[in-house]
A protein has these predicted regions:
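Core beta-strand elements of the Rossmann-like FAD/NAD(P) dinucleotide-binding domain
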Residues: 12-14, 160-170
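Active-site-adjacent segment of FAD-dependent monooxygenases/related oxidoreductases
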Residues: 53, 58-128, 229-231
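A conserved short coil-to-beta-strand element within the FAD-binding core of flavoproteins
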Residues: 137-151
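Conserved FAD-binding catalytic core of PHBH/FMO-like flavoproteins
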Residues: 125-126, 133, 150, 170, ...
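Glycine-rich FAD pyrophosphate-binding loop
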Residues: 33-53
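Beta1/beta-strand and adjacent pyrophosphate-binding region of the FAD-binding site
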Residues: 9-24
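Conserved phosphate-binding and hydrolysis motifs of nucleotide-dependent enzymes
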Residues: 20-25, 169, 175-176
Length: 275
């Protein structure tokens, strides 16, 4: 991975600037590096966020990983998912959405579970292979200036306070839901109106719990919808709807969390035995 040494005191130039080094930005940087395209990646944070977030990708993502020669490394970190079951309040099976357990036309399984920090580490470590790619951490973009045939990116080195700039043929915003790039270029974001509150509980099992099952489970409860997700290794996730007017401080108390995870509408033991 190359070093960006020309931005302090003079205008550095590169083909592409990627703002944000999450999964999308890191994957794009690997693809550009594969083709020898000079790329500068600017990432605000000093390290990868170490808590679970996204948990699922498909065979097309594995095909991309294969393209940049990271599929073999990733295979040891993922879990092939057999699908998802939808059940009612009593645990009665409403829909069995099975995912094939054989490789499809992309050459990979259709459904994978993953742990995002591990996945991001694979992608970011992969950047070290490409001399044309430079990653700068602790850098925050604050302005984009459109020229006739380029874009000037102005950013701050948060470690030193230095104000730097770089000219690129293209700028790609991979900076998440609150994207500064989206706002600076005036691109609208469609609001689909889903503003419900959910409690997300990520857990690591201390002992085998075979009754939880290998499928993810969507509990279609009239009283309190919930989701159970089978993650990688011993990782499991429960997502529980917070009802209108319900106090967030109360529902996050350990006794209340356990009660909701073990209620008939959100207990994977009930659904897996009934399914």
């Amino acid at each position: 991975m190359g070093n960006d040494t020309g931005c302090n005191g003079q205008m550095h130039e590169t083909d592409i600037v990627i703002i944000g080094c999450g999964p999308v930005g890191a994957m794009l940087a690997n693809l550009l590096g594969l083709h020898g395209i000079s790329t500068l990646v600017l990432e605000r944070e000093a390290a990868i966020y170490n808590l679970p977030r996204a948990v699922h990708f498909d065979d097309e993502v594995m095909r991309l990983l294969q393209t940049v020669d990271l599929a073999e490394t990733t295979q040891g970190l993922v879990h092939v998912s057999p699908g998802m079951k939808f059940v009612d309040d009593t645990g009665r099976l409403l829909l069995d959405w099975a995912r094939p357990l054989e490789r499809g036309p992309q050459g990979w399984y259709p459904s994978y579970r993953f742990h995002q920090p591990e996945f991001e580490r694979v992608l970011r470590n992969g950047l070290a292979r490409w001399p044309s790619v430079s990653l700068k951490l602790r850098t925050e973009v604050f302005a984009l200036e459109q020229e006739s045939d380029a874009v000037v990116v102005r950013y701050e080195d948060l470690s030193t306070g230095a104000l730097l700039k770089c000219r690129a043929g293209y700028v790609v915003g991979c900076d998440g839901a609150r994207s500064l790039v989206r706002r600076l270029i005036g691109a609208p974001m469609e609001d689909l109106g889903f503003h419900e509150r959910w409690l997300v509980l990520d857990a690591i099992l201390r002992r085998p719990c075979s009754h939880l099952g290998d499928h993810s489970v969507q509990h279609c409860s009239r009283k309190r919808p919930a989701t159970y997700v089978r993650g990688t290794g011993n990782r499991r996730r429960w997502e529980i709807a917070v009802l209108p007017g319900e106090d967030e401080a109360a529902i996050t108390q350990p006794t209340k969390v356990c009660s909701n995870c073990c209620s008939p509408g959100s207990n994977p033991r009930t659904s897996s035995s009934s399914a």
